Regions:
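Residues lining the SAM
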Residues: 143-145
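Class I SAM-dependent methyltransferase SAM/SAH-binding core
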Residues: 45, 53-130
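Conserved S-adenosyl-L-methionine
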Residues: 48
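Conserved class I S-adenosyl-L-methionine
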Residues: 1-42
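A short glycine-rich, Lys/Arg-flanked "PGG" loop and its adjoining helix->strand segment in the class I
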Residues: 157-169
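SAM-dependent methyltransferase
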Residues: 174-249
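A short acidic, Gly/Pro-enriched loop at the edge of an enzyme's catalytic core
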Residues: 132-139
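C-terminal lobe and adjacent flexible extensions of AdoMet/dcAdoMet transferase-like proteins
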Residues: 239-292
Length: 292
């Protein structure tokens, strides 16, 4: 199964099984970093936004949010959660067509000018390796280990290059990553299982230290017929990769982004060997002024 086939059926039970994630705490930390590095308003793109929980929290802060994800199903859930009411005039794009993006973003801008904006979110069905926005953003974020899903080194560089293209000069890019320490020593080869009223899942993990790849075999049982108590079984295989901090720094620089800080998650301390999750803060190089 390819990475673009993940978060299919799982998307529709994702929020139910991820209800233990402290999104408010994660949001407060992320928002604090945005403020610290000067992003107090403007357009912010949330890459690998999933069902849009973090996207919505940032929209509530007043940012003009764009949520980007390659899973149509995850975005379908996001739209059901946040966009069904008063959102018919803003298109949900499944293709990266600049004219459509332009129309949607200009619509948002007009609402901002007239004071009618409700912090609507523009959701785009795109692979972040092929990111295509109309114009640039003040910041981009990618949290909840979305960047770990980029398992090829060349693809990681490609993502960073796309981010650089669509960031304002001086714009900020914040993303998190799970570490090798987490995959090897915390998660290990554990099997996680949960049973809920309408769905169950079995999550089997295997970490390959030589490649830094963690493989998840996810088996989902979803209730499809309540009357007859029938469940549908589906499987997804997910792959995430742990990267060396130095490699990520070098990759950012190669793409034209300066790595400002690497934090131990949810602290202001530098990342360390036993960090389980780390946050990178990068910035697009300022445009050089050529004096006559």
């Amino acid at each position: 199964m390819e990475q673009d086939e993940i978060y299919g059926e799982f998307a529709y039970v994702y929020d139910e099984f991820m209800d233990n994630i402290p999104y408010e705490q994660w949001h407060d930390y992320l928002h604090g970093l945005l403020i610290k590095y000067g992003v107090t308003d403007g357009i912010v793109a949330d890459l690998a936004c999933g069902t849009g929980t973090m996207t919505k929290l940032l929209a509530d802060d007043g940012y003009d949010m764009i949520g980007v994800d390659m899973s149509y199903e995850m975005l379908d859930v996001a739209r059901q959660k946040y966009c069904c009411q008063d959102f018919d005039e803003i298109p949900y794009e499944s293709e990266s067509k600049s004219d459509s993006l332009k129309d949607a973003m200009e619509y948002n801008a007009q609402e901002q000018e007239t004071g009618e904006s409700k912090n609507e979110i523009l959701f785009l069905n795109q692979d972040m390796r092929e990111l295509d926005l109309y114009g640039t953003a003040a910041a981009m974020v990618c949290v909840c280990d979305g960047m770990n899903y980029i398992t090829d080194e060349n693809d990681l560089l490609k993502v960073f290059e796309k981010v650089k293209i669509f960031l304002d000069y001086g714009g900020i890019f914040i993303f998190d990553m799970k570490t090798g320490h987490f995959y090897e020593n915390i998660l290990g080869s554990r099997t996680i299982a949960e049973n809920r009223e309408d769905a169950s899942f079995i999550w089997e993990n295997e970490f390959h230290k030589d490649t830094g790849i963690n493989e998840y075999l996810l088996t989902i049982y979803s209730l499809v017929d309540d009357e007859n108590d029938l469940f549908e079984r589906s499987e997804e295989i997910h792959h995430q990769r742990a990267y060396d901090i130095k490699f990520v720094r070098d990759c950012l620089e190669k793409a034209g982004l300066s790595c400002l800080e690497v934090y131990d998650a949810f602290t202001e301390n530098a990342a360390k060997e036993d960090s389980e999750r780390i946050y990178f803060v990068a910035q697009r190089h300022e445009k050089k002024t050529i004096l006559a």
